């Protein structure tokens, strides 16, 4: 406190950290200064002049923008003087001259800073009687964002976010003077993975989303805080509903994780909750169709199998379950006693990781405190998009960035060092001794490092990552992220005694090793690189039970399908993110029909089988799940509900990941990963983003495609009796010969990547042709 400066605001003395912006210092002391352009996560620009305050200077009193003025010791500030009030009235009067009277129909009405500040600080009447300026309204600037230029007050929040934060400067000011407007470039839509953030931070209704437009008023909404489970980042979110329907997701400013930002998939992938295609009651497959069946009959049929002591039971779990779901399956699996049982996680990129007591697990905040960030993992922008934003923020603040190719080509514009084909082979092997790399010695050796390490592609060997890991461990002060990106993967690591991945499932499971298979919240046939193998396995297993929301390629093969609640908004629990920070998942809307949580199903089955009672309630399950943690820091509901723990609690633990030593082999020089948008069943049933992951394409550099004599923009992937017509995209950062295939796009799962895939010129402009 002794280093703080003292300032006088409106006759009251307050203290602040030196060099802090005046608007922030006042905010911290409970003194509100109106603003439009200022946002605490963006660079200050002082454009709107709404935050003008009066300060005393040697030359007398002066009006200054508080968003660009730093505090100094003994500063005297007046935020309520007559001159300040007159300036505020003038700013608002100018803003309202051309602002349309759209409040009765505007989505922002009721939570609009322009409305609120006009009432609090504006003139009582308007002197303007001329015709207002008009534009075509609204205009779509992307598939999910609409722009109303009449409402725009030119605060530049959207343009600054796109430039400073996301690195997608696709929306800008055009024209000049009183004709200035915000718009996108001609024939270049606002195709950003983070465009929804501009809607949330827009202080008026100039930017709106197609998913929420004209749906509800803020005062009609019910809200709760929760955690996004779209990837392992664990972004804090606010869920909004009206009339028991989820209508909107907002980012919550959790300083430790997402700082208020969300990717668009995390923001808009909720509309499936209201889909009429949801499974609403248990069904059983017959020879020709499905028939309804009671849950008790499902339990009865499964109990007959479990009663047979020779039966072998296997679980294939999706990574979007809650910690409590994972814990319940783990306990049920253990209660099977002498049954041969195994638990697998529906993840293709699965390896032991680098978890040991000698290596510090990184926190997301460590990115800003590092000397250098080292990345070798799947494309962060596609798989951990908000972590990608945090990396960009750290680099903007002066942290050095070293990236090993070839997945993170989206970071080449900000990387200090990007190692491509000279250092990293097409199979993701390091070709030179790391200690001989000049740039490593300059930026990494002996420095404070935050490393983000994970396989870039399923065929990357464990040994290649281990080389980099061991070098960093021995030569730097390293903190490490293990870049597993699948939903609640880290919750699975904490809750399951041991866990394997899809590679092990495809190698170990057969009708000889499994009599009963539970597939829970997973569609490996639709999305895995082992799709064909897993399909053959599931078709042979005597009894398959699917717990899911929809029918899809995997659940359609099940003998019993039990509808479950969505982790997003329909059930309570906890979620553990990439830094082992556990936070609450909350319920806001009721589940449709006879759906139930996964833990409820397994508890009911356990009771029907007359096993010793596992737990009595969700709260009891939550407490048991974290019984081995310290009482004060265990992420129980009671602890997480305390105000100091709303952002989550970190508890480190060493997972027991069981993987085979055999590396995956691809026949071609292929690089297989996933894009942010894909063909996942929940995305297909979320109207706003359903088409964003529909296109099929491959990527490579220009010389690679020239070898295949491609020139029409399309080509055909041919393998045995399969033909898929796809677009091809040029990525100049790729080495010669390397081709990227997104595994989560439709029909890509039909390809067997271990076999030869021919690439042939396409003579026709067909969207898709699968024989």
Task: Pin down the residues of each PLM region.
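N-terminal single-stranded DNA-binding subdomain of primase/primase-helicase replication proteins
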Residues: 48-70
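A cross-kingdom feature strongest in bacterial/archaeal respiratory oxidoreductases
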Residues: 38, 330, 369-375, 381-410, ...
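A glycine-rich, hydrophobic/aromatic-adjacent loop/helix-cap motif
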Residues: 450-510
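N-terminal leader/propeptide and maturation segments of large enzyme subunits in energy/redox metabolism
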Residues: 101-130, 589-645, 714
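N-terminal export/assembly segments and adjacent metallocofactor-ligating motifs
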Residues: 2-27, 35, 39, 56-60, ...
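Short alpha-helices
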Residues: 406-407, 413-437, 454, 569, ...
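A generic structural motif
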Residues: 338-351, 401-408, 476-489, 541-551
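Acidic/polar loop patches that form or flank catalytic/metal-binding clefts of enzymes
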Residues: 207-213, 246-248, 340-342, 403, ...
């Amino acid at each position: 406190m002794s280093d703080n400066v003292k300032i006088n605001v409106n006759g009251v003395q307050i203290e602040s950290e030196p060099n802090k912006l005046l608007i922030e210092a006042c905010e911290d002391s409970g003194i509100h200064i109106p603003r439009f352009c200022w946002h605490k996560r963006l660079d200050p620009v002082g454009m709107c002049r709404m935050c003008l305050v009066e300060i005393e200077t040697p030359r007398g009193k002066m009006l200054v923008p508080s968003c660009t003025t730093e505090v100094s010791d003994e500063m005297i500030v007046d935020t309520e003087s007559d001159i300040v009030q007159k300036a505020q009235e003038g700013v608002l009067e100018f803003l309202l001259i051309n602002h349309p009277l759209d409040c009765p129909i505007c989505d922002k009405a009721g939570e609009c800073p322009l409305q609120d500040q006009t009432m609090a600080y504006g003139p009582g009447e308007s002197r303007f009687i001329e015709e207002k300026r008009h534009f075509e309204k609204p205009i779509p600037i992307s598939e999910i964002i609409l722009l109303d230029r009449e409402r725009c007050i030119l605060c530049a929040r959207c343009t600054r976010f796109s430039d400073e934060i996301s690195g997608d400067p696709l929306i800008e000011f055009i024209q000049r003077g009183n004709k200035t407007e915000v718009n996108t470039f001609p024939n270049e839509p606002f195709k950003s993975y983070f465009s929804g953030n501009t809607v949330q931070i827009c202080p008026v209704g100039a930017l709106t989303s197609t998913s929420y437009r004209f749906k509800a008023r803020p005062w009609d909404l019910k809200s709760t805080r929760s955690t996004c489970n779209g990837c392992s980042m664990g972004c804090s979110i606010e869920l909004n509903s009206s009339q028991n329907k989820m209508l909107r997701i907002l980012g919550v400013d959790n300083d430790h994780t997402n700082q208020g930002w969300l990717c668009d998939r995390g923001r808009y992938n909720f509309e499936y909750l209201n889909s009429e295609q949801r499974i609403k009651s248990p069904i059983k497959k017959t020879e020709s169709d499905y028939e309804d069946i009671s849950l008790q009959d499902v339990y009865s049929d499964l109990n007959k199998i479990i009663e047979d002591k020779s039966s072998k039971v296997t679980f294939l779990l999706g990574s979007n379950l809650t910690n409590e779901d994972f814990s319940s399956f783990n306990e049920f699996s253990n209660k099977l006693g002498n049954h041969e049982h195994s638990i697998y996680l529906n993840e293709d990129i699965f390896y032991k990781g680098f978890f040991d007591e000698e290596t510090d697990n990184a926190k997301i905040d460590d990115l800003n405190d590092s000397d250098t960030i080292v990345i070798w993992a799947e494309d962060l922008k596609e798989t951990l998009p908000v972590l990608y934003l945090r990396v960009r923020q750290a680099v903007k603040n002066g942290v050095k960035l070293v990236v090993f190719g070839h997945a993170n080509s989206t970071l080449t514009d900000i990387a200090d060092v990007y190692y491509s084909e000279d250092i990293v082979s097409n199979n993701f092997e390091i070709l030179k001794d790391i200690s001989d790399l000049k740039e490593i010695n300059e930026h990494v050796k002996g420095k404070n490092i935050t490393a983000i390490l994970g396989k870039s592609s399923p065929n990357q060997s464990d040994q290649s990552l281990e080389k980099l890991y061991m070098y960093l461990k021995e030569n730097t002060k390293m903190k490490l992220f293990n870049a597993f990106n699948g939903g609640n993967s880290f919750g699975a690591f904490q809750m399951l005694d041991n866990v394997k991945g899809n590679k092990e499932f495809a190698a170990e499971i057969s009708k000889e090793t499994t009599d009963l298979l539970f597939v829970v919240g997973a569609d490996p046939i639709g999305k895995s690189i082992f799709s064909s193998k897993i399909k053959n396995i599931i078709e042979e297993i005597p009894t398959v039970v699917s717990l899911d929301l929809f029918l899809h390629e995997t659940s359609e093969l099940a003998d019993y399908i039990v509808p479950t609640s969505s982790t997003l908004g329909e059930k309570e629990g906890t979620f553990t993110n990439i830094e082992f920070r556990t936070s609450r998942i909350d319920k806001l809307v009721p589940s449709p029909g006879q759906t139930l949580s996964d833990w409820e199903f397994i508890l009911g089955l356990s009771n029907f089988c007359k096993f010793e009672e596992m737990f009595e309630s969700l709260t009891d399950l939550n407490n048991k799940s974290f019984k081995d943690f310290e009482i004060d820091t265990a992420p129980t509901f009671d602890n997480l509900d305390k105000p100091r723990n709303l952002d989550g609690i970190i508890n480190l633990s060493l997972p027991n990941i069981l993987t085979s030593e055999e590396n995956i082999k691809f026949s071609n020089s292929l690089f297989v990963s996933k894009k942010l948008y894909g063909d996942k069943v929940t995305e297909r049933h979320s109207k706003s983003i359903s088409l964003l992951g529909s296109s099929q394409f491959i990527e490579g550099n220009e010389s690679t495609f020239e070898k295949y004599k491609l020139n029409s923009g399309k080509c055909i992937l041919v393998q045995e009796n399969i033909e898929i017509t796809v677009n091809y995209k040029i990525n100049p950062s790729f080495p010669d010969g390397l081709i990227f295939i997104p595994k989560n796009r439709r029909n890509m799962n039909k390809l067997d990547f271990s076999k030869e895939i021919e690439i042939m010129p396409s003579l026709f402009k067909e969207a898709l042709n699968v024989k």
